[in-house]
Amino acid sequence: MACAHLCKEADIKTALEACKAADTFSFKTFFHTIGFASKSADDVKKAFKVIDQDASGFIEVEELKLFLQNFCPKARELTDAETKAFLKAGDADGDGMIGIDEFAVLVKQ
């Protein structure tokens, strides 16, 4: 639960329950439910660094697929369709990855 310290446990539980079934994940709903939209730029950067598991400076497809597990290790992987939609929404420059600035915009949507 690497990102759990940035959010309330009850909010994380609610957000994960809402997308428990395959193909029900909505990044907007998830970020809103866990309160990321109101987080400071520093907290958003901390979350980005956790999600960017290989410390490349970008969140790649495989890291997006495991996104929910950053909040609860037992959470499911995102489906290919969910991962593709998440990447499309966050990858403003079309390089196939989400950078820190793109992530900061994404969480505020």
From Swiss-Prot:
<feature type="binding site">
    <location>
        <position position="52"/>
    </location>
    <ligand>
        <name>Ca(2+) 1</name>
    </ligand>
</feature>
<comment type="function">
    <text>In muscle, parvalbumin is thought to be involved in relaxation after contraction. It binds two calcium ions.</text>
</comment>
<dbReference type="GO" id="GO:0005509">
    <property type="term" value="F:calcium ion binding"/>
</dbReference>
<feature type="binding site">
    <location>
        <position position="56"/>
    </location>
    <ligand>
        <name>Ca(2+) 1</name>
    </ligand>
</feature>
<feature type="binding site">
    <location>
        <position position="93"/>
    </location>
    <ligand>
        <name>Ca(2+) 2</name>
    </ligand>
</feature>
<feature type="binding site">
    <location>
        <position position="60"/>
    </location>
    <ligand>
        <name>Ca(2+) 1</name>
    </ligand>
</feature>
<dbReference type="GO" id="GO:0005737">
    <property type="term" value="C:cytoplasm"/>
</dbReference>
<dbReference type="Pfam" id="PF13499">
    <property type="entry name" value="EF-hand_7"/>
</dbReference>
<feature type="domain" description="EF-hand 1">
    <location>
        <begin position="39"/>
        <end position="74"/>
    </location>
</feature>
<dbReference type="InterPro" id="IPR002048">
    <property type="entry name" value="EF_hand_dom"/>
</dbReference>
<feature type="domain" description="EF-hand 2">
    <location>
        <begin position="78"/>
        <end position="109"/>
    </location>
</feature>
<dbReference type="InterPro" id="IPR018247">
    <property type="entry name" value="EF_Hand_1_Ca_BS"/>
</dbReference>
<keyword id="KW-0677">Repeat</keyword>
<dbReference type="InterPro" id="IPR008080">
    <property type="entry name" value="Parvalbumin"/>
</dbReference>
<feature type="binding site">
    <location>
        <position position="97"/>
    </location>
    <ligand>
        <name>Ca(2+) 2</name>
    </ligand>
</feature>
<keyword id="KW-0514">Muscle protein</keyword>
<feature type="binding site">
    <location>
        <position position="102"/>
    </location>
    <ligand>
        <name>Ca(2+) 2</name>
    </ligand>
</feature>
<feature type="binding site">
    <location>
        <position position="54"/>
    </location>
    <ligand>
        <name>Ca(2+) 1</name>
    </ligand>
</feature>
<keyword id="KW-0020">Allergen</keyword>
<keyword id="KW-0106">Calcium</keyword>
<feature type="binding site">
    <location>
        <position position="63"/>
    </location>
    <ligand>
        <name>Ca(2+) 1</name>
    </ligand>
</feature>
<feature type="binding site">
    <location>
        <position position="95"/>
    </location>
    <ligand>
        <name>Ca(2+) 2</name>
    </ligand>
</feature>
<protein>
    <recommendedName>
        <fullName>Parvalbumin beta 1</fullName>
    </recommendedName>
</protein>
<comment type="similarity">
    <text>Belongs to the parvalbumin family.</text>
</comment>
<feature type="binding site">
    <location>
        <position position="91"/>
    </location>
    <ligand>
        <name>Ca(2+) 2</name>
    </ligand>
</feature>
<dbReference type="InterPro" id="IPR011992">
    <property type="entry name" value="EF-hand-dom_pair"/>
</dbReference>
<feature type="binding site">
    <location>
        <position position="58"/>
    </location>
    <ligand>
        <name>Ca(2+) 1</name>
    </ligand>
</feature>
<keyword id="KW-0479">Metal-binding</keyword>
